Amino acid sequence: MTVQEYRQTRFTPPKGATEILLVRHGESRAARADAPFPLVDGQGDPELAPQGRVQAEQVGQRLQRLPISAVYVTKLQRTTETAAPLCRAIGRQPNQNPDLHEVHLGDWEGGVLRIKAHENHPIYLQMQA
């Protein structure tokens, strides 16, 4: 008996449609209890770690061949740093959009979430359940 296979095909947007590609920022620097991240509008704003800069270069190289008409970033430096290699490669400036932002972590901003996760804090474990 032959089993039918259903192969995945690449989605092609219809003519006139806008295709949106979301890119997560590169790895940011490690959190430390004695050196909390600076805050921008109440959100932790660490810079990219060395590995994050490598990731940003790699994503820039990969995406530079696509027909990109605009690049949008948040106020946070890690998003601007991640977009920089791509923007250089395609000759565009990133558009900072104040309506784009991450989930606000309240008291767990500034790297505290990472520390609580490492400590297996009960609230963090409950969030993961």
Residue ranges and their predicted role:
Residues E47, R88-A129:
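Phosphate-handling substructures
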Residues T2-L21, E27-Q96:
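Active-site-proximal alpha-helix that buttresses catalytic centers in soluble enzyme cores
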